[in-house]
A protein has these predicted regions:
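Conserved catalytic loop/helix region of short-chain dehydrogenase/reductase
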Residues: 25, 29, 143
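Conserved acetyl-CoA pyrophosphate-binding loop and the N-cap/start of the following alpha-helix
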Residues: 30, 34-42, 121
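Conserved GNAT acetyl-CoA-binding A-motif
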Residues: 47-60
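Nucleotidyltransferase catalytic core that binds NTPs
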Residues: 59, 67-72, 77-170
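Active-site beta-strand termini and strand-to-loop segments that position acidic
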Residues: 4-6, 87-88
Length: 170
């Protein structure tokens, strides 16, 4: 998304992909005009209309204050480099807390898969991994950038692992 001046020159921009906001910039000659807030508000609205309610971004440390003032909260910081932020005050911490609720004794393992589509090979991989640990955490890539939509892939995976009681789907 971009904003233009009277001469049709881009003076502010920002973009979004999946549940992230990115690439914000405001021309130095137009800073202080509220363009950042207009771009951010527009992109958050776009994301909400898409159903992306939990948003993430990373930014330079010097720019984090602008996002903080607009309702974003720090998740992590790389000193001197960047800040990772979200639009929920304790969203990431709550996610980590919920993960501890699934903690079990014994060996735990994790798999991350796209499953585009979920095949017998994927099922064999999950079964083999599950047989070698007490608890297997299975994470399915949720980005809808492939031929098979996430909702279909999720359904196929859940059906394909339903006989495995030690697999926790995330």
């Amino acid at each position: 998304c971009a904003m233009y001046d009277e001469e049709h020159q881009i003076v502010a921009t920002g973009s979004c992909f999946a549940n992230t906001l990115r690439c914000f910039a405001v021309s130095s000659s137009h800073q202080g005009e509220g363009l950042f807030n207009q771009i951010l508000t527009h992109l958050v609205d776009v994301q909400y209309r898409r159903g992306n309610l939990h948003l993430f971004l990373y930014t330079k440390i010097d720019s984090a204050k602008f996002f903080r003032d607009s309702g974003f909260y720090e998740i992590a910081k790389v000193d001197g480099s960047l800040v990772f932020m979200e639009n929920r005050k304790n969203g990431f911490q709550e996610y980590l807390t919920n993960l501890t609720k699934t903690k079990t004794d014994g060996l735990s393992a994790a798999l991350v898969m796209n499953a585009n589509p979920f095949t017998l090979g994927h099922q064999y991989l999950v079964e083999t991994a599950a047989s070698q640990c007490h608890t297997l955490h299975l994470f399915l890539v949720s980005e809808d950038v492939s031929l098979i939509p996430f909702s279909v892939r999720k359904k196929l995976v859940l059906e394909g692992i339903s006989h495995l009681p030690n697999v926790i789907f995330h």
